[in-house]
Amino acid sequence: MKESFYIEGMTCTACSSGIERSLGRKSFVKKIEVSLLNKSANIEFDENQTNLDEIFKLIEKLGYSPKKALTKEKKEFFSPNVKLALAVIFTLFVVYLSMGAMLSPSLLPESLLAIDNHSNFLNACLQLIGALIVMHLGRDFYIQGFKALWHRQPNMSSLIAIGTSAALISSLWQLYLVYTNHYTDQWSYGHYYFESVCVILMFVMVGKRIENVSKDKALDAMQALMKNAPKTALKMQNNQQIEVLVDSIVVGDILKVLPGSAIAVDGEIIEGEGELDESMLSGEALPVYKKVGDKVFSGTFNSHTSFLMKATQNNKNSTLSQIIEMIYNAQSSKAEISRLADKVSSVFVPSVIAISILAFVVWLIIAPKPDFWWNFGIALEVFVSVLVISCPCALGLATPMSILVANQKASSLGLFFKDAKSLEKARLVNTIVFDKTGTLTNGKPVVKSVHSKIELLELLSLALSIEKSSEHVIAKGIVEYAKEHNAPLKEMSGVKVKTGFGISAKTDYQGTKEIIKVGNSEFFNPINTLEIKENGILVFVGRAISEKEDELLGAFVLEDLPKKGVKEHIAQIKNLGINTFLLSGDNRENVQKCAFELGIDGYISNAKPQDKLNKIKELKEKGQIVMMVGDGLNDAPSLAMSDVAVVMAKGSDVSVQAADIVSFNNDIKSVYSAIKLSQATIKNIKENLFWAFCYNSVFIPLACGVLYKANLMLSPAIAGLAMSLSSVSVVLNSQRLRNFKIKDH
C-alpha cells in the first residue's frame, strides 16, 4: 500500500534522513521518501503487517508529528520577522555590555565597566538576562534539538542546542565564581560567553529566516495552482443554476461558467463562447478564444462572457488535479544525486558531536597555559565552535532546493516533471524518438488539393454530407474545406462505418439514390483510376456500381503541417549532439518527406505500436538513453519503454502514468527546454554540493584549532556567522535557477 502524509518538526536533512533510516529498517516498509522542504513523506508498506496509525506511532517516538494534512500553525504572539528583529536588538545589547569597555570605556557607565567584583557581576547579570531573552526567541532550536537527541536522532538543532547550552552553563559557572570570589587569575575573572550564545542564535535565526522565505517563494507555484481550484461550481438543473461542490460533479453535468470565474473541471463548451487565461497550462499570458466544441480545462480563468459547458472529467481526474499531483511528486521525490548527501548526513551530526568532544579533551590537555580555567575556556570555545560551525543544512538543502526552484521555473515554461529523477535524467538523453501526428505536426490535416471527375461543388457536397457525422481528424479537415467553399448539405441514410477504411451512405446523386463512399484506397474496388502525383494523405470519393465495383469520382489530398518552429527546435536538439528518429504509422512518402523537411536523422514508416516498441528496445540495447516524445494517446507502450517519456498534452489527453515530463504548451521547444533545464539544475546541485562539502571539510578543522600556531582561532560567534552564511549561500545559489532562460540559437 502507498500512502502520503505530512511530518512536522523537521529542521534539517538529518531529521528527514533519520526518519527514512529508522523506518527503512522495518521489514514491512518497502520504500520511504521524506521531503524536508515539503514536510511530506511518501511510503510504501505491507498492509498485512501494519497500518498507517502504527507508522505514525513510530514517527512520534522519534520526536516528530505526523499528520494526514498540514494544520495551520498556531498564531504566535510575535511574527517570525518581529522575533528576528528582537533577537538582533537584544544581541546588540549583550554585545554592547560585553565588548563596550574593550572598544571604549566611555561607552559604558562606570557601574558596568567590570573593574571590580560588583560591577562585573552586575554587567554579567544584564548579559544573562539578554541572553535568556534571545534563547527564548530561539527556543525552537532547543525544543527540537534536545528532543531529537533524546530519541538518538541528533540534527542541526541539536548541535546549536548543545553548543550554546554548554557556553551558557560555563558562563553561569564563571558568574558563580565571580559572585563567590573563587576566581584564580585575571583571565578567568568573569570570562563569559553570553554574547557568543546571542550572536550564534541570531545568525542562525537570520539564516533560517532567509532559508524559509526562499522555500516559501519556491513553493508558490504549487500554492498558486491550488488557489486556482474553485471549491464550488454552478450546475444547471431543470433550467436553474445550483451551486454545488466541485467534488460532487460527475461526467456529463452541465455547468455555467460566469465571467471572472475559474473552470471547475475539464469539459467542452456547448453554448456560448469565452476568452480563457490558460497561462497555468502553457505559460502563455495571452487569453485563448474558445467556442462551441472547444475543450476547456480546470484551473483556467474565464475573462469576459459566460458560457455553458459539459463536464468530461470529475475533479479527481481533472487537468489541475493531475498537475498538482505531478508538482507534489516532483518536490517530494529525491534525485539519485542526493543519495550521497543523504548518506553523509546520516552520520554527519553524530560525527561532529564526537569530533567536538575529542577536540575539547585534547585542548584541555595540550592548552599552553598551566591554569585549568584558562585551558577550560579555550577548550570550551573550540567545543562550541566545532558544533556551531558544522552545517548539515548546506548538505541537506543542496539538492532539494535546486529541484524546488527548477520545478517552479519549469511550470512557468508549461513543463511539468513527474519526479526528481525525471528532471535529473533528461540531461543524459542522447537519442530522441518522435511520434509524428500531433507531436511534430498540428494533428489537424488540411486539404491541400482536390482532384475531381465531376463538378467540384458536387464532389464537396457529397464529401461534406457523409463526413460531417465523423469525429475523425481527416474527416474534420474535409468538412472544414467544404464549408469554406459553401458546399450544400445532402440528406443521408444508411450510414455505415468501416473502421480504418472509410464511411458510406445512400444519398441523392444526379437524380438517383446512390451509395456514396469516402475513404482510403483499400475501401474501393475501382473500375477507373485517378492520377495523383502529390505526396499527402489521400481520401477518395466514389460511388458503388455493384457490391464488387466502385467508380471513383474524385480525391482529396490532405497534409498535416508541421507545427510552427519545429524545424528550428529540432536543429537546437541536434546541436546538443542528440540523435533523432521519427516513428509514424503514416505511409513511407509522407514520413520520409516530414523527416527530410525537419532534418530528422532516421525514420520508420507504417509503424504499428509494436514496431515503435521494438525500435526503442533496439536503441536501448545499443546503450542509448532514449527519450520518447508522443501525444500520450496511442503511444503508451513506447512511452513506458523509453528512459524518459515526454507527452505533448492537451489538457485531459495527458497520461500521467506514462509520462515522465508533460508539456502543456504542445510545443517541441519544450523538449529542448526540458533538457537544458535538467542540465542547468544538475550543474546547480553540483555547485551546491561542492560548496557544502568544501565548507565543512575546511571550517571544521579550523574550528578545531589546527591553525592555532598561526594565530588563527575561530570564536563561537564567528562560527555561528559562518554556518549561517553557508546554508544561505546554498539557498541563494539555487535561486539563480529563477533566471534560467532558453536561448533561441
Swiss-Prot record:
This is Copper-transporting ATPase. Probably involved in copper export. One of its GO terms (biological process) is copper ion homeostasis. Mg(2+) binds at D631, D635. One of its GO terms (cellular component) is plasma membrane. Its EC number is 7.2.2.9. It comes from Helicobacter pylori (strain ATCC 700392 / 26695) (Campylobacter pylori). It comes from the Bacteria. Cu cation binds at C12, C15. Belongs to the cation transport ATPase (P-type) (TC 3.A.3) family. Type IB subfamily. Keywords: ATP-binding, Cell membrane, Copper, Copper transport, Ion transport, Magnesium, Membrane, Metal-binding, Nucleotide-binding, Phosphoprotein, Translocase, Transmembrane, Transmembrane helix, Transport. It is a multi-pass membrane protein. The keyword Glycosyltransferase does not apply.
